[in-house]
Amino acid sequence: MGSNTEATEIPKMPLKIVFLTLPIAGHMLHIVDTASTFAIHGVECTIITTPANVPFIEKSISATNTTIRQFLSIRLVDFPHEAVGLPPGVENFSAVTCPDMRPKISKGLSIIQKPTEDLIKEISPDCIVSDMFYPWTSDFALEIGVPRVVFRGCGMFPMCCWHSIKSHLPHEKVDRDDEMIVLPTLPDHIEMRKSTLPDWVRKPTGYSYLMKMIDAAELKSYGVIVNSFSDLERDYEEYFKNVTGLKVWTVGPISLHVGRNEELEGSDEWVKWLDGKKLDSVIYVSFGGVAKFPPHQLREIAAGLESSGHDFVWVVRASDENGDQAEADEWSLQKFKEKMKKTNHGLVIESWVPQLMFLEHKAIGGMLTHVGWGTMLEGITAGLPLVTWPLYAEQFYNERLVVDVLKIGVGVGVKEFCGLDDIGKKETIGRENIEASVRLVMGDGEEAAAMRLRVKELSEASMKAVREGGSSKANIHDFLNELSTLRSLRQA
């Protein structure tokens, strides 16, 4: 009887959501996975981007559930290369080869605001899910009468840290950059060295103004979608709701919803290498798709990994700088790579890799990371204790979550925030620190055992969150039901 009733029901028009992503690999991947997650639920999802970014997005979509494609599409806005002085095809911050390209890409994104608005009007969506770096979408959404929801690539904890800092200005109460500050009113006692706060927090810059615009736009938004899950940051989710009054939907880990099946030509050789290693014996090392260390820091990383006594996979982006010629003659990344190949002690990879494929391999037992939110969350989902090496963005906040709150990792001892163009220039982390941190996390001591136990529990909780009845799954249903209600009210 029930099946006959269902068969005669008039199908509802599917919801339509437009997604806007900042053109940088990490942001794009998480937006694609979020759009794919909603597409699984029958939502018509449209990602708006520029032509050069299509191959990355297409590849990311093809690695997910095949049924997603009927509900997920890509629409294009041309990028103004000539107007901003960039060569054709440079439309992504990950493609930057010199510092002056970044502001040109940003200028290009501002130029295409109007054609992007026109395209959104043509699509006539029920909701705009916007990367935080498009604050203009807040007023635009109000203009066309649909909810604008912010997509946050980071978690609740760093958002709460930033709210505490901008509300209470604890950094202004100390004189020296090497002094510690306490972040007031947070659920846990959080201390940070002043020098690890972003430079635009310590001293006003153009980026400070942008962040004020982003914060103001967020407060005018309908709510925030966050790639996290309740059991990871429940106290901070409640804190954020209370201090901002915003609706929050934690829907992660996003990567678990879509069942990403990453493959890459040549990856069979890497898997074969890992298959020959013992359970939990290899540490995975990666600093994301943007960071490039200068030669002297690469040398310290190499020495620290080698002397740790643990096998490793190191995914590296070498700096374009040549460094000191005498040092280059004595040591080079290529020489180290060949040495590790001969000793079978390490795998050095100088290209993009399917990270989840590595993290989920049984031989991987830990991770050395820049603590970018997405990478950190993938490590936690895989049940790996972390060695933290924050560099920029919200990564120093993430380190405090990992080390002080969750207690699932240790830091290498970074003491100063750096911009993308200053990586490895302000501060050099010595091989001794790297070796000691890797030994601690990968060792068999009580502290390491406790970390592994805690992160395994979080891993299980992350998987439970995305199952039917789990917190993230429920939040997705609540979000889509709310959009349906809002659409009905608009059409009434």
From Swiss-Prot:
Keyword Glycosyltransferase carried by entry: yes
Application notes: Soapwort saponins possess anticancer properties and are also being explored as enhancers for endosomal escape in targeted tumor therapies. They may also serve as precursors for vaccine adjuvants.
Keywords, comma-separated and alphabetical: Glycosyltransferase, Transferase
Pathway(s) served: Secondary metabolite biosynthesis; terpenoid biosynthesis
GO molecular function terms noted in the UniProt entry: UDP-glucosyltransferase activity; UDP-glycosyltransferase activity
Active site: 27 (proton acceptor), 131 (charge relay)
Transmembrane parts of this sequence: none
InterPro entries in the record: UDP_glucos_trans
Function: Component of the oleanane-type triterpene saponins (e.g. saponarioside A and saponarioside B) biosynthetic pathway, leading to the production of natural products with detergent properties used as traditional sources of soap.
Entry similarity comment: Belongs to the UDP-glycosyltransferase family.
Name of the molecule in the record: UDP-glucosyl transferase 73DL1
Native source species: Saponaria officinalis (Common soapwort)
